Structures are given as C-alpha cells and as structure tokens.
Amino acid sequence: MSNRMWGGRFASGPAEIMEEINASIGFDKRLAPQDIRGSLAHVAMLGKTGILPQADVAAIEAGLKTVQAEIESGAFTFQRALEDIHMNVESRLTELVGPAAGRLHTARSRNDQVATDMRLWVRDTLDALDAQAADLQRALAALALAHSGTVMPGFTHLQSAQPVTFGHHLLAYVEMLGRDRGRFRDARARLNECPLGAAALAGTSFPIDRHATAAALGFDRPTANSLDSVADRDFALEALAAAAIAAVHLSRFAEEIVVWTSAQFGFVRLSDRYTTGSSIMPQKRNPDAAELVRAKAGRVIGALAGLLIVMKGLPLAYSKDMQEDKEGTFDALQTLSLCLAAMTGMVRDLEPVPEVLKAAAGAGYATATDLADWLVRELGLPFRDAHHVTGRLVGRASARGVGLEALSLAEMREEEPRITEAVYAVLGVENSVASRTSYGGTAPANVRAQAERWLAALGDTQ
C-alpha cells in the first residue's frame, strides 16, 4: 500500500531510497501497545468534549482493540510504505471502520503522538528495570548475610589494602543499585507529564481536555508548553544516563567476577549455567556471562552519547533527526534489562571459597593499617609517626619474605621500643575486620545488620 496519509501536497510518491531511510516501522513497531493506549485515551477525550460523535468514538475504540489483538496474535502485517507505527495502525483502522478512522487524528499530530508513545514506553521500562534491580539487590544482600564474616582482601589499585568481609564487598553493590533505582524513579517522575494535545508544535484550536487525557494515561499532568512538548527528549536522555550509570556498576562487578573466577585468584566459583567451554582447550570454564555484561555496558553508554549528539544542534520544535531517539533507547534499556537478569542469576549461583579468600586477605601486609592504628591508640604516637614506624616494619618483613606477624617482638622494638606482645592481636585478619565497627565499616556485626536491613526494606523473596 502506498503512503497517502500526508500526500495531498505531493504530485508523486517518494523515491525507494527515501522510503527506506524514512521508514521507522522496523523498530518503532514495539511502540504499538503504547500507541494504541494513547489513541484510546485521545478518542475517549474527543468524545467527552463533543468534538467527535459517540458513534465514531465507539467505532474507533472497537477498531483499535481489534488492531491491538491482531498485533498481539502476530496476524498484523506491518508495511514499510506506511513509515511508522502510527500510520500502520491508522491504515488498518481505516480498513476496519472506514471514514471514522480519519477523525481519530483530530487535534493531534504525529509529533505529540510519538512523544507520548515514547514517554509511555520509557516509563514502563523504567518500572521494569527498577523491579529487576531490586531482585539483584535481594540476591546480593542474601549472599552478603550468609558471608557477613567471610574474610577477604579489600583492594586499592588492585593491590591488597585492608581485610574486609565478602558480605561487606557485596553490600557495596547493593548501595550502588539503590542509587540506580533512585535515578530510575527520579527519571520516571520527571517524564510523567503528557505531551498529547500539544499537536504539531503550537497546540490546537479544538476545545480538548488535556488534563483528562493525561489522567487516563497515568500521567501526573499535561506538559505546560506545546513547543517543549514535542521538542523534548530529556526524558529519554535522563533514562539513558541512569541506565549508563547502572551499566557501569554492573560492569565493575562483572570485571571482579572475571578476575575472582580465574585460576590465579580462585575466590569464587560460577555455576555451569553461566560459563562456557573452549573449542580447543578442554579444561576451560570461561565466565562469558560476566564478560558480556562488562562489554554490553559500552552499548548503553554509546546510546546515551549518540542521542546527546543527535539533540545538541536541533532548533525547536520537531525535526526528523529525533526519529533517531528510538533504536538507541530501545536497545540500551533492553540491554540493561538483560544484564540485570544475567547478573542476578550469576549471584544466586555464586559460591565463594572462604579458605582462599582468607588466605588472600592476609597477604600483602593487609593488616599494616591495623598496626599503625594500634601504635596511635596504645602508645599515643601521632598517626604520621605511626605510619613511618609501620612502613619500616613492613620493609623488614618484606625483606625476609614473611608476614608482619612473623616478626619477633625484639625486631619490632628496634623500630619502636614501647611495642608490647599485645600488638600481635591486631595482626590477624579476623581481628582486623572485627575492629572496624564504625558505621558503614566491615565488622561482621555491621554487615549482618546492614544485610538484614536491606532484605527487610526490599521484602526478602529469596
């Protein structure tokens, strides 16, 4: 079918390449549920305000529901010649109900229509991402609770720094995901205004009720400026920014899983369900799910950068450039959804290896800070002096290839004569983590309390 919905001004149809570059139905057909929801709300408002007779309203509503059923069943045929989801739906509606279908577009433009569709889709997707992030938080918090006392090395510069607990490490990601969910909700709150009724850019002379349409679609209010209504894609940018930050968090954890599962670390085991083998090396168990989560963060970040570049030079109000908002937004948010699901599955199957974690926690002089703190607390040394004393003791131990706990009291007293036998109590990794009782610290009691608080707040459905 040729496109004649806007063809009155034109003597001939578009070139084939124009049709190809112009069409968006290949990707915006996923907006069908939102497009039909918007049309149903719009036609109901047109009827209530007396703009359309009820007979036309009833016919259009019935036709839209038939179109929806056809799309859901797979019986609907999408046509590239009709450009986009709006025209595909309207064309089929015309076949079903005749001339009444042409009245659906009264007091509406594709400009406000697509802006409404996109806001509805992004809103639905943010809600789903929020729920998925909560699922991952539950999985992490449950594992953190089970390993609140499992000692592991804490790193800076990927070098052993201080002992922490495995549960404490996991709760760091629970906190990150909490901020991610806050950004999803913030983005949702700001996008929850309805552009429908702004028409092409200037509003309409028909006596429409935009507040009624907004309420019917679950928006808080209609948008206040018709130009901004159709020119704005901040809602997509903000959703993509929130998604990009969340993807970075998942990527960081994925990187740690890749490192931790390596033979060189052996901190954790991934289940067979989230690993793959090698076509040539029979011993391999590759952490492909984690590697793909790490890689896919780039797609999400790229979508944000891409849409920023599209929007940066556009004058008000609508330009066809804005059609490029869809593919990147769809792909990025659905990619994040996939990554959240994969990470949740990996965490639920993740098996820490406590004996390996503990052994690694004691390596690299990880209790050196505990020794410095002991010198301050017990001997009254200024911290900078304690730092230097400890550094010299680490140098002695390193030269001998032993841990701090292997130094004799006599050796320690050569650096600080007042050191006593009591110092050895702080050199064990369990004592180190147990001493970190400050709010937010890694002491097992703290970790248990924080994990329990999170599980209670999230509703533990493990």
Swiss-Prot record:
Gene Ontology molecular function, alphabetical: argininosuccinate lyase activity
Listed A to Z, the keywords are:
Amino-acid biosynthesis, Arginine biosynthesis, Cytoplasm, Lyase
Q: One Pfam family name from the record?
A: Lyase_1
Q: Which InterPro entries match?
A: Arg_succ_lyase_C, Argininosuccinate_lyase, Fumarase/histidase_N, Fumarate_lyase_CS, Fumarate_lyase_fam, Fumarate_lyase_N, L-Aspartase-like
Give its E.C. classification number. Answer: 4.3.2.1
Enzyme class per UniProt: lyase
Query: Which top-level group of life is the source organism from?
Result: Bacteria
Which pathway does this polypeptide act in? Amino-acid biosynthesis; L-arginine biosynthesis; L-arginine from L-ornithine and carbamoyl phosphate: step 3/3
GO cellular component terms, A-Z: cytosol
Cellular compartments annotated: Cytoplasm
One GO term of the biological process aspect: L-arginine biosynthetic process
Entry-linked NCBIfam families: argH (TIGR00838)
| Family designation | Belongs to the lyase 1 family. Argininosuccinate lyase subfamily.
State the name under which the record lists this protein: Argininosuccinate lyase
Q: Which gene encodes it?
A: argH
